[in-house]
């Protein structure tokens, strides 16, 4: 996967932490996530990388009585399933990166098992967002106002303006930002959050999210609550 797509995956997963704040509320009427500490495993997937998509980044989002309390990055590199062999003719144990080979439903279960085996963190629900899905949501509310200034820059370029990340192979020496990659991404997240306060943009984001869910670019387990949630609450908890 090329550098641009890897940055997109980083953007996807951090923004999805905010979207999960909305999604999580949809489970509050069910007994499994209503009370106590619960976890949602959020998977960022490059849909066209391989069969089923390549899982490039994940976060475990921790809920405290339905409110996001924390999130923990889960880096797929080196994480394997305790008992399953690799799918698709690959050799060795099943890797977290490749667990979606046979499709999202089975893949989400494999992802839960792999993450729990390797980290001890149990997931009560799983959300997949493919890069196509979040790209569409981001693009639907351009131009963004970043730090009070309207910009038509791409999400990747917004991050590049602010970060000082020099560790990626091939990165040129023209580093102009003074932030960590995480903080630079949060600049974009804040911009999207502010955009969602505009009722028209919020409605647009909600509509696109529902469309992307219908296209299969956002997948949830347990399923069935996303459309109802987005139709009623939209992206309010991002604000």
Whereabouts are the PLM-identified features?
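Non-catalytic, solvent-exposed segments at the cell envelope interface
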Residues: 2-13, 18-239
